[in-house]
Curated annotation (Swiss-Prot):
Keyword terms of this UniProt record: 2Fe-2S, Cell inner membrane, Cell membrane, Disulfide bond, Electron transport, Iron, Iron-sulfur, Membrane, Metal-binding, Translocase, Transmembrane, Transmembrane helix, Transport
The protein's name: Cytochrome b6-f complex iron-sulfur subunit
Species in which this protein is naturally found: Chlorobaculum tepidum (strain ATCC 49652 / DSM 12025 / NBRC 103806 / TLS) (Chlorobium tepidum)
Gene name in the database record: petC
Membrane topology: Multi-pass membrane protein
Phylogenetic classification of the source organism: Bacteria, Pseudomonadati, Chlorobiota, Chlorobiia, Chlorobiales
Presence of keyword Electron transport: yes
Amino acid sequence: MAQTGNFKSPARMSSLGQGAAPASAGAVTGGKPREEGLKGVDFERRGFLQKIVGGVGAVVAVSTLYPVVRYIVPPAKKIKIVNELAVGPASDVPNGTGKIYQFNDDKVIVVNHGGSLTAVSAICTHLGCLVHWDEAADMIACPCHGAKYTQDGKIISGPQPLPLKQYKVKIEDGKIVVSIA
């Protein structure tokens, strides 16, 4: 079907010699060609909008997740560091036994061996397992990898690289008092 009216295609116009010469592809009348004017610019409207929507989505996600995570993960308790602390009554550790207490940020095992109290770190120096007093073997033992220590934390055998950290211990007013050595 043929076009009716005053429509003339650019190709026909140039062959008939009427009107201005057709603009080359990509050129903007009265300015630079499109390729030249946007050289080095690498974004389009769609890409720009995608980045804006993505950024808004990220802000919404973070602002929603932050309070949820704060609610689920409890705040760390701040431990007041002291030089000396009464950890419990002297009757807690009868002769031939040992008991673990919290002292500052460490766990301490207090051992009563023949009426003599000693206190050492209850954390094995090998991999950080909790040690215990082995009454039958008369020593401090680590259940994880078989580390063995004397009552005062010295190495007997096992894979541990260092002896247990020592603390001072005394009985004062019927209470066991542990202090930094």
